[in-house]
């Protein structure tokens, strides 16, 4: 995020990031035209080189910015943001039906590139050192959750409405957390092909839905023990927060690194710090 280079002049326009077949691009163009989106800028990655060992051959790594539909003029910022999420989810579900597209993000000033394989070999294969591809805030993780089949939707980092995170750790409370988030009646709380995705969605729920700060995110996912809360100056408030949002407590050692819409970058860990950040 906070893009530079060739994409910097288009910060105010939503950027679609994903992997598409030629048929997927055809479907995308038809879909976006029906909604009134006009292509503003294309920065797609095509490579004629043989992919590295373990990396599937793809048609197009698509990065495309759009002008908003005229019909969206006058909409509130919240409504625009919710519509962007709805469009991304609809495109993702279209692609899941026939494998023609994988959509990772649709948001202003953000691109997401995901692939399977050796990180350095993939970076060289995709030419990620090209001059036009620059950003001031970059989250990169060379792993995905090992408890699930290899799928790009399960690869870190995860992103939702301007908040992003990547995780190293365990989350044995994945089931209850997923059920809680899925019941919040928000389109973006979906997918969950990795238990680490809930870290991003809890961050979104904390900051966007509850209007709380980053410090409260830490108290929600890894709250203090009851005896520690007794000594805290905000004891009553934090006890209420802990008990009312008990369903969002992460059970297991973890380290989370993420970014907020204002480009704040953070790291949060459980109390035992068994997953080092550095």
Language model regions located:
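Conserved short alpha-helical segments that host acidic/polar catalytic motifs at enzyme active sites
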Residues: 1-278
């Amino acid at each position: 995020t906070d893009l530079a280079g060739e994409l910097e002049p288009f910060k105010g326009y939503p950027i679609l990031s994903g992997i598409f077949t030629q048929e997927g691009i055809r479907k995308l163009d038809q879909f976006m035209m029906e909604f009134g989106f006009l292509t503003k800028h294309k920065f797609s990655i095509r490579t004629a080189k043989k992919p590295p060992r373990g990396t599937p051959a793809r048609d197009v790594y698509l990065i495309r910015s759009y002008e908003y539909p005229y019909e969206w003029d006058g909409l509130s910022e919240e409504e625009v943001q919710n519509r962007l999420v709805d469009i991304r989810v609809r495109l993702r579900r279209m692609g899941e039906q026939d494998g023609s597209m994988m959509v990772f993000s649709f948001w202003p000033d953000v691109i997401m590139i995901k692939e399977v394989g050796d990180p350095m070999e993939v970076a060289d294969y995709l030419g990620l050192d090209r001059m036009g591809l620059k950003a001031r805030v970059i989250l990169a993780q060379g792993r995905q959750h090992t408890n699930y089949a290899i799928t790009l939707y399960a690869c870190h980092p995860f992103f939702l409405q301007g908040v992003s995170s990547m995780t190293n750790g365990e989350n044995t409370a994945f089931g209850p957390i997923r059920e809680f988030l899925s019941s919040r009646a928000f389109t973006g709380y979906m997918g969950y092909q990795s238990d680490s995705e809930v870290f991003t969605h809890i961050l979104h729920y904390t900051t966007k839905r509850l209007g709380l700060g980053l410090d409260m995110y830490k108290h929600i996912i890894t709250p203090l023990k009851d005896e520690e809360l007794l000594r805290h100056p905000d004891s009553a408030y934090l006890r209420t927060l802990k008990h009312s949002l008990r369903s969002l407590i992460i059970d297991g050692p973890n380290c989370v690194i993420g970014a907020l819409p204002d480009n704040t970058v953070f790291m949060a860990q459980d109390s035992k710090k068994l997953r080092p950040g550095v």
